Amino acid sequence: FQDHRDYQWGDDPRAIHWAAYARTGQLTMKLYRAEVSPIVEIVLDASPSMFMTETKAIRTESLLLFCLESALGNGSPVRFHAVCGNRIIPLEIDAVRSGSWKELIHGLGADETMPVIPVWKGDGMKVLISDLLYPGDPITLLGAMNAGGGTSVILAPALAEEAAFNHIGNIRLKNCETGQTRIQRITPSLAAKYERAYERHFSLWRETCRRFSASMARIPAEGSLSNALCGDALRQETVEMR
């Protein structure tokens, strides 16, 4: 066991720390690793938009490693999965550390739909690394994530250039998930409409996270990871300084 707490009525007497009782006369309960450091489930959204630019790909990988080292540093058991749409694969810790996970996720293909994540456990910490750039009601994902209790956290890498059009006129647009392209004329009014839709999308995610008592932070892809985590993530108490 790794810790102890005071005995409470109804506790299993088999877990009483009798040696401590002999010394102090106080009933205490042994706490084992799973109780002190609950399992951390980390799921990576492996859809192509997470790796759309080198800057965003680097941020995605840095968040994955940050979550790994944070969990291990806390003495918590950790499990990894990568998901794209309704396809999901486990990732070994060694693969995450070495970077070989990037080869493994190629088999997941591309899918622009909201991921289906059946691996969440009822208790412990659940961490989703995803840019949340897919259609659908956030309730679908957060309902499954929050089922059974525990702590739910979303870390969303965000690329500044995704939030607005920097070009007015004809532009070739490419769906990074499907590879489809089209020519679109961007007018000032259309650019403004896009920006409002983008803001509404993430406002809906934030509102739904609050309803489910989940923590969500958007992590800028630009700059160092330490600086990026000192923004929204620190304000939302998704991470804490130690």
What residue ranges belong to the model's regions?
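Exposed, interaction-prone extracellular/peripheral surfaces
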Residues: 6-11, 20, 29-42, 46-62, ...
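Intrinsically disordered, low-complexity, positively charged segments
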Residues: 1-5
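N-terminal juxtadomain amphipathic helix
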Residues: 13-15
